[in-house]
UniProtKB/Swiss-Prot annotation:
The protein's role, per its UniProt record: Plays several crucial roles in viral infection. Participates in the opening of the viral DNA origin to initiate replication by interacting with the origin-binding protein. May disrupt loops, hairpins and other secondary structures present on ssDNA to reduce and eliminate pausing of viral DNA polymerase at specific sites during elongation. Promotes viral DNA recombination by performing strand-transfer, characterized by the ability to transfer a DNA strand from a linear duplex to a complementary single-stranded DNA circle. Can also catalyze the renaturation of complementary single strands.
Name of this chain's protein: Major DNA-binding protein
This protein's record includes keyword DNA-binding: yes
Domain of life: Viruses
Organism: Epstein-Barr virus (strain GD1) (HHV-4)
Location relative to the cell: Virion tegument; Host nucleus
Length: 1128
């Protein structure tokens, strides 16, 4: 755990005093209701909805998400401040029906209520008092019918809002500009701020708002903790927040356990560990969520690049619609994946005596089957009878996913269910080959239009939730009860530091101590710097970071030259990198075995996508991970203090305080969750605040109130780290077969080689006359050694092309251990670079593990299979449906796999990935428990088509197991959508590019006279300006190779005197005529024998120190042993 920061450099201390929240009033006449609807969770008939907190549409620009909330006055002359941050979403409660629904399907509220009952979760119980009337919280002069009302609430006091214990003070209204609307906000203070008390009628309470919080927020928390009494959980959270009871056990009496736990041989310990893990999550998760957070750039809605080219409100709504479509795969994955974090069902304990580590014997399990089973309370008394599931197959048993399971995933909230359904509308159906079904049109006009439909009664068949469920039914996961230790899928924003290149964190020199001072002339050459240098070299060749070319090849000669230039750039960088490693005595052969791909999951709620669904997923992910990392700690404590027949609440009464106190040092910063502890202070003993007692009576006075902090220490979460080992080092035979590289030469080495996708892209350019496909042409060449030559083309050029492709593919086949076929030149260059490094490290036997990104691509398709485009109109027949949809299109989304995730990770992506948290102890007698978050696998065949087992590339059938060495991550870049791309602080001058290009040419051609190429490049870049170059100009342009200045100037003078045109082609032809080409001068050379000793030479010059000489000799010998075996 990092030490506490000083008061002046943490966000909590820098925040300003303020209220516990605000009620915002937006004028309906100017407020962009359709944009709010596209961001919100409205459904047909909603009375309250949630919308993300965003500067420029729900709050004013410059809104501070961190505040020191004045929440109590122990006496009239002292105030207590508490540092907290705002909740990620706001709640629209007044005139909410004016916001259009995001999903138009009817009947969601009744469906959620019925499903909540069958799953045993309690419904919201309104307080025994009426909701506040608009006159109680509206400022004077505002017409309640002309404004939309919403609450922005802080994390620490959202339970006080839920229970109606905040007080609105309309006299303290402030006018703010929210977007283009002149809005008003009214502060909310805790009733404890008023020592003399506040009449209940003045306390702000809205039953629709509290019901929305109960369903959309707190039910999800209860599901993550596996408790069904949601209202009681909210009471306990409020009590913990007010009375600082984080170290007191609270939720254990609410826990319920399935039959698998009750019947377990070690059920007592299992129940105690499960309950203790939940208690720790309840104690620490709220503290982390309410901590001060950095304000991300994506919070500024009014500066989203998404709207840069939008003209008018319609274009803005369409842009938001496309942005939502790019987020749909993350949401659908959580629904379609069997191991979704939404389906985590409990804690299990392994009973076998396998090789599983003792610390991994307790683990989180998932399964919808477990979630609908009967449960018992901590005293082993039945409390929920269970639900058998709908009669879908006539067997009256679980096994088939039903609409009720989708409602469970949405936390029985009609708001969240509407948002989930909206995202699922973007998904394509995958029809099972085993169950032929009627067409969508027949279903919509038939069964969906029947009055028997429980949701729409046949009035809105096109947008009914049952119709959507019918269209996607083959993608939903099976309902089963599993006790396996599988990964669970989490979703959220990626952290800022990811190492996802082919070799991950190889040679990053982070967390490695320096034993001694390093000379200034020996800087560390990291793997990250190597990749940056490679990209710079490629940019000089006209290849951008995404692999796009400035100048496309126009024939076989250009095609071969393009690859030879890239090969030369890669080889030069490899040699320099290997030289640096050998020079610095780096044990790279050992380091490559322990390198990982590293991804970070951000713990900042405001970094998450602007969507209430992702707020729910973030809360669920954080709570599940906190429980997971606490399991071995609870297990060890229970082993030392066995329950001996005690129920979990009884055991926790005596041990929880010690367990909770030690958890911070035992679990944080131990490999998975990183956090910092900050000390929050208020710099002044007093602060200027309005006189709240007078303001309550409508009088406005200011006063200087003495204040102090009620809570000093704050735990600020940073990131969750997920790793993936790059080089296979295991002993498992099945896994080994998946990674081992076959030694037999494949017949179709060209098709699976590095050039195939480029040969296909430029097929019509290279072979304009042929009717053969590129796949067949090159497969045929690998067997018959013949290629077609277009009429009028040079046979020699095509022969050179074929020989280059053949030779390069054969060499690639021998050395390649990176199982991708590159799709652009950057991936090609990185594959060649990393293959060379791995060969130098001796890693040639096994393929390395890869992370591939699944990046969403939106597209417009005919609306025949997407009935929701028809809206709520009636459908009489299948023919009428076909006619109505024939002219319409629907926006859908598909995912494309990227070969290398590193470029996507630079764009601050939203990620969805499976994670397994392994626990282990340290080495050399260190008995501390550490954790490692490892990247896992998705379960469920309906998740995405890219995850289905493919037959392989080309014409061969690939043996099963290739997917074992490829891990997948769903990634949606946000750079350019919600975050502006960074512009260069300083513009690059043309002369800098010329200088860099000349130095690159000389560096790559040190073994030959490069003046010819330097002059031609200079003429190409500067033209006639070459004639007036001075010696100083030439020395600057040549940089560290300025000794060539005289030769270059002489050659330029020769060209100037000839009177030819100042173009690269003319200069090249002229110099070839004069010199016969580069290096054509024939000189006589004599052989000079190597001197036998150096003693006689040493006396004539400086005598070098023995230590330096020996060290240099050792490094040279080491380099000499590396480079001959390095094929580049």
């Amino acid at each position: 755990m990092q030490g506490a920061q000083t008061s002046e450099d943490n966000l909590g201390s820098q925040s300003q005093p303020g209220p516990c929240g605000y009620i915002y009033f937006y004028p309906l006449a100017t407020y962009p209701l359709r944009e709010v609807a596209t961001l919100g969770t409205g459904y047909a008939g909603h009375r309250c909805l949630t919308v993300p907190l965003l500067c420029g549409i729900t709050v004013e620009p410059g809104f501070s998400i961190n505040v020191k909330a004045l929440h109590r006055r122990p006496d009239p002359n002292c105030g207590l401040l508490r540092a907290t941050s705002y909740h990620r979403d706001i709640y629209v409660f007044h005139n909410a029906h004016m916001v259009p629904p995001i999903f138009e399907g009817p009947g969601l509220e009744a469906l959620c209520g019925e499903t909540r009952e069958v799953f045993g979760y309690d419904a919201y119980s309104a307080l025994p008092r009426e909701s506040s009337k608009p006159g109680d919280f509206f400022p004077e002069g505002l017409d309640p019918s002309a404004y939309l009302g919403a609450v922005a609430i802080t994390e620490a006091f959202k339970e006080r809002l839920y229970s109606g214990n905040l007080v609105a003070i309309p006299s303290l209204k402030q006018e703010v500009a929210v977007g283009q609307s002149a809005s008003v906000r009214v502060p909310l203070y805790d009733k404890e701020v008023f020592p003399e008390g506040v009449p209940q009628l003045r306390q702000f309470y809205n039953s629709d708002l509290s019901r929305c919080m109960h369903e959309a927020l707190y039910t999800g928390l209860a599901q993550a903790l596996r408790v069904r009494r949601v209202g009681k959980l909210v009471e306990l959270l409020e009590k913990q927040s007010l009375q600082d009871q984080a170290k007191v056990a609270k939720v254990a009496p609410l826990k319920e356990f399935p039959a698998s736990t009750i019947s377990h041989p070690d059920s007592g310990a299992l129940m105690i560990v499960d309950s203790a893990a939940c208690e720790l999550a309840v104690s620490y998760a709220p503290a982390m969520l309410e901590a001060s957070h950095e304000t991300p750039a994506s919070l500024n809605y009014d500066s989203w690049p998404l709207f840069a080219d939008c003209e008018g409100p319609e274009a803005r709504v369409a842009a938001l619609h496309r942005y939502n479509a790019s987020l749909a795969p993350h949401v659908s994955t959580q629904i379609f994946a069997t191991n979704s974090v939404l389906y985590v069902s409990g804690v299990s304990k392994s009973t076998g005596q396998g090789k599983e580590s003792l610390f991994n014997s307790f683990y989180m399990t998932h399964g919808l089957g477990t979630l609908q089973e009967g449960t018992w309370d901590p005293c082993r008394r039945p409390c929920f009878s269970g639900w058998g599931g709908p009669d879908v197959t006539g067997t009256n048993g679980p096994g088939n996913y039903a609409v009720e399971h989708l409602v469970y995933a949405a936390s029985f909230s009609p708001n969240l269910l509407a948002r989930y359904a909206y995202y699922l509308q973007f998904c394509q159906g995958q029809k099972s080959s085993l169950t032929p079904v009627p067409e969508t049109g027949s279903y919509v006009a038939g069964a969906a239009a029947s009055p028997m439909c429980s949701l729409c009664e046949g009035r809105a068949p096109a947008v009914c939730l049952n119709t959507l469920f019918f269209r996607l039914r083959d993608r939903f996961p099976p309902v089963m009860s599993t006790q396996r230790r599988d990964p669970y899928v989490i979703s959220g924003a990626s952290g800022s530091y990811n190492e996802t290149d082919f070799l991950g964190n190889f040679l990053n020199f982070i967390d490695k101590e320096d034993d001694g001072q390093r000379p200034d002339d020996e800087p560390r050459y990291t793997y990250w710097q190597l990749n940056q240098n490679l990209l710079e070299r490629l940019s000089r060749l006209g290849i951008d970071a995404e692999g796009k070319l400035e100048k496309e090849p126009h024939g076989p000669r250009d095609f071969v030259k393009m690859f030879k230039d890239v090969d030369a750039a890669v080889d030069a960088e490899v040699v320099q990198f290997m030289n640096s490693m050998a020079k610095n005595n780096i044990t790279y052969k050992d380091l490559v075995k322990s390198c990982y791909h590293v991804m970070q999951y951000s713990c900042n709620p405001f970094a998450q996508p602007a969507c209430p669904i992702f707020t729910q997923l973030f809360y669920r992910s954080l709570l599940t991970i906190l429980q997971d990392i606490s399991l071995p700690i609870c297990m060890c404590y229970e082993n030392d203090n066995p329950g001996l027949g005690q129920s979990p609440p009884e055991w926790l009464k005596g041990h929880y305080q010690t367990l909770c106190t030690n958890f911070r040092s035992l679990a944080i910063d131990k490999g998975v969750l990183t956090a910092k502890e900050a000390k929050v202070v208020h710099g002044e003993p007093t602060c200027d605040l309005p006189d709240l007692d007078a303001a309550l009576q409508g009088r406005l006075y200011g006063r200087r109130l003495p204040v102090r902090m009620s809570k000093v220490l704050m735990l600020c979460p940073r990131n969750i780290k997920i790793k993936n080992r790059v080089v296979f080092t295991g002993e498992n035979a099945a896994l080994q077969n998946s990674f081992i590289k076959s030694t037999t030469r494949r017949e179709n080495y060209i098709i699976n080689g590095p050039y195939m996708k480029f040969l296909n892209t430029y097929h019509k350019t290279l072979f304009p006359d042929t009717k053969l496909s590129s796949l067949y042409l090159w497969h045929n060449f690998s067997r018959r050694r013949s290629v077609p030559v277009p009429s009028g083309a040079s046979a020699e050029e095509y022969s050179d092309l074929a020989l280059f492709v053949d030779g390069g593919s054969r060499a690639h086949e021998e050395s390649n251990v990176i199982d991708v076929v590159p799709g652009n030149l950057v991936t090609y260059a990185k594959q060649r670079l990393n293959n060379a490094i791995l060969k130098a490290c001796g890693q040639t036997q096994f393929y390395i593990s890869l992370i591939q990104g699944l990046v969403p691509r939106t597209q417009s398709v005919p609306a025949r299979d997407y009935p929701h485009v028809l809206g709520t109109r009636a459908v009489e027949s299948a023919a009428a449906y076909a006619e109505a949809t024939s002219s319409l299109t629907a926006t859908t989304v598909v995912c494309a796999a990227t070969d290398c995730l590193s470029q996507v990770c630079k764009a601050r992506p939203v990620v969805t990935l499976p994670v397994t948290i392994n626990k282990y102890t340290g080495v050399n007698g260190n008995n501390q428990i550490f954790q490692a978050g490892n990247l896992g696998y998705f379960m469920g065949r309906g998740v995405d088509r890219n995850l289905l087992q493919a037959p392989g590339a080309g014409l061969r059938k690939q043996a099963g197991g290739s997917s074992m060495r490829k891990k997948f991550v769903f990634a949606t870049p946000t750079l350019g959508l919600t975050v502006k791309r960074r512009t260069q602080a300083a513009t690059t001058y043309e002369i800098e590019n010329i200088r860099a290009g000349l130095e690159a040419i000389i560096s790559q051609k040190q073994e030959e006279d490069c003046v010819f190429d330097v002059v031609c490049n200079l003429v190409d870049a500067m033209g006639e300006a070459c004639a007036s170059l001075t010696r100083d100009d030439a020395e600057y342009l040549l940089g560290r190779f300025s000794v060539l200045a005289d030769s270059v100037l002489e050659t330029l003078a020769t060209i100037a005197s000839s009177g030819i045109e100042w173009t690269a082609g003319a200069a090249r032809d002229f110099l070839e005529g004069v010199w016969g080409g580069p290096g054509a001068a024939q000189d006589n050379f004599i052989s000079v024998a190597e001197p036998v000793g150096t003693a006689s030479q040493a006396s004539a010059g400086l005598l070098l120190g023995g230590g330096g000489q020996g060290s240099g000799g050792r490094r040279k010998r080491r380099l000499a042993t590396v480079l001959p075996g390095l094929e580049v």
